[in-house]
Amino acid sequence: MQKYYPYLITLSHMINDSCQSVLPALLPLFIYTYGLSLEQAGFLILANTALSSLLQPLLGYISDKLNQPRLIAAGTLLSACSTGMMGFVSSYESLLVCATLAGVGSSIFHPEGAKIMNRLGGGKKGKAMGTFAIGGSSGFAFGPLFAGAIAYTVGAHGLAAFTVAGIIISTVLFLLMPRIVAHAQTIDQAVATENPTVAAQPLKNYWKYFGILFIIILSQSVNFRVINAFIPVFWTHELGTSPEQGSFALTVFFSIGIFMTYIGGLLGDKYGPIKIIRLSLLIWLPSMFLLTQVPEFSVTIMMPLAYLILLMIGDAKAISYSPVIVLGQTYLAKSIGFASGITLGVSQTIGGIIAPVVGNLADTYSLPAAMMTLVPFLIVGLVASLLLKDPKKLQ
């Protein structure tokens, strides 16, 4: 049974991030139903991310001090219930409340989830985080497809399925968590026995280099969250597809991550996380620029090119996912929960603060022009990656 504990945490991650992916996938429906502007749609994303972004580091800090792994179950339950309620509300204001609560659930889940997976990984933390990331990538990949299929066929009430899944996995986690923690303690002891010299060294926090990593996280987060929010709208408004095809495009974007997040973890273990982070940004930067130019191409090649670029961006995001988490936890070895709250939670949410700004620019000019403003963030991230140092050389 013990060997399945990491997969149980990963399953919880999948359900939690499935809930986070519902709102962007259904933005075209909400825009139509409530007559929203793109700026208002952006504020829905902001509601889903702002409070969560503020809570992530705080909850991570509390996690380091108090160690409450059952928050993994509580966070998943809150996200799932809030997502289900989106199918039953009748106003834009109610949607804002549900979106906010779903974001809070995410902020509760991620620090403790990443912290326990770090311990369960033992000496192969990149692989462990790659496994954990599969859950998140699967959730973001299939959540939009599932939500779109429900909302555009049987109706928005079908979102209650997310609540049912959340209740089941949260109950199982709550009951098994004492055993999972005991198993993690056994792994900690085994690692200390195998590496007594490393275990004897006092843990240190390298805030300077974590700050540089945080700049990279911001550059990635801004791009990731805006793409996540507006890809369905980009497909329907700029490329002339149906809403279902817009949801499918979002699924394609995240599907590539299911495999590549795991590969990124393995590559990080082999070559070091810094090299993989730099490679990610080198791929992401030109791909983001090219995506904004797709509507200018002929209809014959427009859609194939759009999907190809989307896959490249998905690859770039996915391979850096685990290395960013592991590097952050290594730089802040004394504060793994806090580091996880920044690298995993905030990296998925804080970029949503920019979504209303991009939405406003899209209303004023065009969506491709608004998305072009994301490219400078990646340039800053790439430059910052050149300033990172291997944690082994800092000891």
Task: List the predicted regions and their residue ranges.
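C-terminal membrane-cytosol helix-exit motif in multi-pass small-molecule transporters
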Residues: 164-191, 384-389
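Helix-to-loop junctions at the C-terminal end of transmembrane segments
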Residues: 55-67, 261-272, 362-363
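Helix-loop-helix hairpin linking two adjacent transmembrane segments in secondary transporters
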Residues: 123, 132-179
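Extracytoplasmic gate region of multi-pass secondary transporters
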Residues: 23-24, 208-254
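Cytoplasmic helix-loop-helix junction between adjacent transmembrane helices
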Residues: 98-135
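Conserved MFS/SLC helix-loop-helix module at the cytosolic interface between two early adjacent transmembrane helices
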Residues: 54-90
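Residue-level signature of mid-helix packing/kink "hotspots" within the transmembrane helices
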Residues: 21, 49-57, 140-141, 254-262, ...
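C-terminal transmembrane helical hairpin of 12-TM major facilitator-type secondary transporters
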Residues: 273-324
